[in-house]
Amino acid sequence: SAQHVLQNHINAYQQLQTALSQFTVNSPSLSGVTYQSAKAYSSQVLTPLLRASILLDEAIIAACRKLPSEYRSSVDSVDLRESDLVDRIARADRIVGRYQELINIEYQRTKPNWSRIQNLQTARSNQLTVKRKLEEKLHKLRAFHQSSPQIFSQIAGLHSAVQQGIRQSQQSWNASTKTFVLPPKSEMKWAEEVNGKWEERE
């Protein structure tokens, strides 16, 4: 399943995160400009990028779990399509109209059949109930469609952070100086936001 794949991604990111932590914290013997720039690059760019990737996949998993449960609690236990509901409501409305026509015809007779009228009225009432319930489901479905994007609200921001991190990671290596060049602080807002979310997660 998609959730299983995402969880595998998260596990891989966490392993990379552990390796980076060991490189930046537990390798005091490594020195020199290249190693120092690599440590700074790892802690300030790669670590937030891995965190953003983990947070993104976790947000997708959470949204995938929440969407069906929200649908069941807000709309119905079965899958509904708006076009089907609209068609069924229109059909119920036509049936109600037909029953009303038959009732009117019966009333216009010289000797109306009151038993038949009563049966038609009962059938009309039942069909009105069906129509009302279908309209309620349609209203709930449309309300759910309007609110469901909120379930995925965090994903767009995290995806943007991942893209910025990837872009910066691809541009950080300076081949002429053989060092990693950190982006200016003004371009690291994504990392600050990710680190803040990471602290909330922990």
Kindly label every feature range from the protein language model.
Residues 1-202:
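Intrinsically disordered, low-complexity charged segments of secreted bacterial virulence
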